[in-house]
């Protein structure tokens, strides 16, 4: 039996109420002082990392005990992550900082199923968490010889400017030209198996105005970007995306473009710079410019719609207008959402009763959730435009430079690379040779634990749906096996549907996503409207013309739902928008009859559909 050593730090956990204080997040007029207690279970004899993969903290909020569970965000940085700034004489300085043992976490509150957390544990706890439906911020109070932290609500941070802040996107621009993969990287065979997650390899660019705003403190700027990216990563996790930082560029001496308050000018200039310079220097899928200037009017962000993977337009520009990093993350997530084909939410969209990320303006309490509309629009864009650059998970093999032992990048010929002998914190790896130490089977990976392969059968990737079984360690490798799905067309949900790319699409779920609770699939007679071939009732478009459904295909056109919600009696409810004609259509792979599924507007035999 494995003995467990319980490590307890700072036993004090009593709260204290304060009326006003100045913190990094701004002037806070109501806060609570807490003393988080860290409790971590370590196997006896285990070597503790500087920042553990999993941690647990206990403290009190409003007098009630809270247990915060944290897990390191292992998808925050790519293995070839780089940072670039410039010397006073204009020389470019690029480094590959150690990122494996970073201090950024996602988490949850014990016994609160709707809770979330995005926390930096670099110097105390700093970040945000959702508890009982409310968003709280936490950060150290920077008192000498004290573990005191302040916990407060976003609404209690004084705002310098109460005017509503808006996204500048008003036009429904879409790129209908074929979007080709920018990178020449070929997927390894294991990656050709369908992966439920998409990976957006992102470069963040910080302009000279930001450097001036933060008095040239590059560490403060970097920390702000890390925390914002960690928040953003959590937001996209529920969309089945991983937003991975592959690079941070800080224009320390001068801007590489002219950054103006005119968002149209600045967005186009940044897009041109990205296309002509950045793509040649750094493999990536998307770039975001963070600026310290004030955009014209109330605009704080701007981006192209439906442009992910486009060599020029896969960009967004964001104004850093709030000291709260969660706010910056929301704007970054919002603008990237436009790149992924997502429009602004309207009155029909919802996200569990909370404000939604894709609202046209920043809500009084920044949201961490995408709406049902956003989910449908995003995946509709992916299915219809196939932006291939987001299909590959960032790997060490993406690196083009010659292998170099000690750079913390796992390259050809190396079994491990933990940095220089002075900085190496991996007990499994010989830093001088980049080979595993004697007796070690592995040095990293989801199936590696204390330098040994994890036991065969240990779960390493959870099931995401009935059509997506969990993966388990083999006992022979440090890596989790490739993610595999049940075969397309296999029955699921008690034969109500058929598996399709790891999901089980059925009309009831699609109705719920569009309209909310008390919504069901409509009677068959409602779908007869799809025979009309008019502006809303059709099966598919060919050369811009809407093709009416044949009798056997009517359940593969517009989706019809029965609304039994209070005060409603609509047996044939449907959704149509001129701005997004695809929204409200039955999704591919949906069951349309016994033994049949929708494919390109036809109801076809499931045995031949795939």
UniProtKB/Swiss-Prot annotation:
Ca(2+) 2 binds at residues 407, 409, 411, 414, 417. Expressed by the venom gland. GO terms for molecular function: calcium ion binding; metalloendopeptidase activity; toxin activity; zinc ion binding. Glycans are attached at residue 372. Residues 198-394 form the Peptidase M12B domain. The proteinase activity is slightly enhanced by Ca(2+) and Mg(2+), but is completely inhibited by Zn(2+). Is completely inhibited by phenanthroline and EDTA. Not inhibited by PMSF. Residues 21-191 form a propeptide. The active site is at residue 335. The keyword Glycoprotein applies. Transmembrane segments: none annotated. Keywords: Calcium, Disulfide bond, Glycoprotein, Hemorrhagic toxin, Hemostasis impairing toxin, Hydrolase, Metal-binding, Metalloprotease, Platelet aggregation inhibiting toxin, Protease, Pyrrolidone carboxylic acid, Secreted, Signal, Toxin, Zinc, Zymogen. Residues 1-20 form the signal peptide. Ca(2+) 1 binds at residues 201, 285, 389, 392. Disulfide bonds join 309-389, 349-373, 351-356, 405-434, 416-429, 418-424, 428-451, 442-448, 447-473, 460-480, 467-499, 492-504, 511-561, 526-572, 539-549, 556-598, 592-603. Belongs to the venom metalloproteinase (M12B) family. P-III subfamily. P-IIIa sub-subfamily. Snake venom zinc metalloprotease that causes hemorrhage and dose-dependently inhibits platelet aggregation triggered by collagen. This inhibition is due to its binding to glycoprotein VI (GP6) and collagen. The binding to GP6 results in inhibition of the signaling pathway (decrease of tyrosine phosphorylation of signaling proteins such as Syk, LAT, PI3-K and PLCgamma2). Preferentially cleaves alpha chain (FGA) of fibrinogen, followed by beta chain (FGB). Also degrades the extracellular matrix protein fibronectin (FN1), and cleaves collagen and von Willebrand factor (VWF). This is Zinc metalloproteinase-disintegrin-like acurhagin. It comes from Deinagkistrodon acutus.
